[in-house]
Amino acid sequence: PSHNPELLKRAHENDILTEGYRVVAYCPSCQTSLSHSEVNQGYEMVQDPSLYYKVKLQDEDVYLIVWTTMPFTLVTDAMVGFNPDEEYVYVSVGSETWIIGKIRLEEFMKEAKMEDYKVLKTVKGSEFEGKKYTHPLLGNISGLEKMSKQENYHITIAEKFVDVNAGTGIVHLSPANGEDDYNI
């Protein structure tokens, strides 16, 4: 007991005690954080809702069609991810131009019940790295407009972990709700 402060001091001096940040699962009813094993203990496959939504790029008159399996995290959306090595298509739909992963185009258009569209061009996901977009709820969430002005907020990233075989091949990332998203 009386030696605990000394142990902490030595650990800090030897650089084995550090301070950092990470996302931790939290149980509101227990009012405590949960370990990875506690979170995984009750794991079972369930049907989750997914959501497609549009975000407009700020430097082009085009919309990214983004997919998420966690719609409740949209309010804390900070980035949109592309796979740098995969192909994405610019698609004319009515009076708008959408960007969708090429592999998922036909399946997505069937799911969205869109029959009248035209592919305009194809580009690699790496071409979208670092572009700013406008969050769809920008005027509806307190403080979001201020955060959106930050250089590294509401930007597109190109990362190999993005799965182009699901959704639209463009995913939303919410560092406030996912450890992997936070680590980016």
Can you name each region flagged by the protein language model?
Residues P1-I184:
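NTP-handling and nucleic-acid-processing catalytic cores
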